[in-house]
From Swiss-Prot:
Similarity-based family: Belongs to the ARV1 family.
Keyword field: Endoplasmic reticulum, Golgi apparatus, Lipid metabolism, Lipid transport, Membrane, Sphingolipid metabolism, Transmembrane, Transmembrane helix, Transport
Role description: Mediator of sterol homeostasis involved in sterol uptake, trafficking and distribution into membranes. Also regulates the sphingolipid metabolism.
Name used for this protein in its record: Protein arv1
Subcellular location: Endoplasmic reticulum membrane; Golgi apparatus membrane
UniProt GO cellular component terms: cortical endoplasmic reticulum; endoplasmic reticulum membrane; Golgi apparatus; Golgi membrane
Species per Swiss-Prot/TrEMBL record: Schizosaccharomyces pombe (strain 972 / ATCC 24843)
Residue stretches spanning the membrane: 71-91, 122-142, 153-173, 179-199, 208-228
Residues of the signal peptide: none
Designated gene of the protein: arv1
Lineage: Eukaryota, Fungi, Dikarya, Ascomycota, Taphrinomycotina
Primary location: endoplasmic reticulum
Cited InterPro entries: Arv1
Record membrane topology: Multi-pass membrane protein
Keyword Transmembrane helix: yes
One family name in Pfam for this protein: Arv1
Amino acid sequence: MKCVECGAEVDSLYTYYGRGTSNIRLAQCKNCKQFADKYIELDVVLISMDVILMKPQVYRHLLFNSLSARTFRNVVNFCILISLFNVFLVWSRLEKRAALFPYFTPAQAFLSQPIIRQYLTLLLICLVETTVYQISVVLLLCLTMGWKSWTSASGAVILSSSTRMLPVFMVIWDYDLSIAATVVEWVVLFSNVDALCILTGSRRYFKIGLIVLFASLVRSIVVYIFLHLTGLSQIQPSTPCDGFQHFVNLLCVYFRSITLTAQTAV
């Protein structure tokens, strides 16, 4: 157990006085004199908001004071939920793109397949991209930093990837842009780096950043192969442009290729 404010080791997080969650007293950290874990008394909604805001305190609470063999199942369920949201986002964007470009064959060809096949294909791509990224990060942490606990590393990546659910609100309010998915993916990568640095207790942001970046490149290669096999690799039609706009488009393509996922592909 660790203090969420300073990261120092603590003997206990609270003192239990009787039945009910209100009959507890939060322990004080001897190092920083703050409450060791203020999130014990907060509900899931407030904790989720701090996770989206990438606060280091909530990462320490989840990774050091809450994560166990039992709670890791909930983390895996959360990962599956994110994948299901990804399927919804990709599917909705494909339908919008097919409506905007009725003569653009890749989207039309994919959407002409049976609905079950469409869903299973997108679900497979989303699950594979998540699994490949998770395995790559864990293996690289083990090989380069000697990290032993794969559950904590995987949990850190999953919990810090909750920002990926934000584009759902953009779809609901009809502000969905293709560049937004790429921006969100880069925010997720920075969040992963932050969470892994907190987990390992290391300030080597550059080294962990390279680990996350390399894992993202491996994921991009696998996703491109799957998109090529399903005929979705050329789903975004190119638009002619010149000058500064051409440079911006090339820059966007470069950043998108590093974080290629099913979301950024469409």
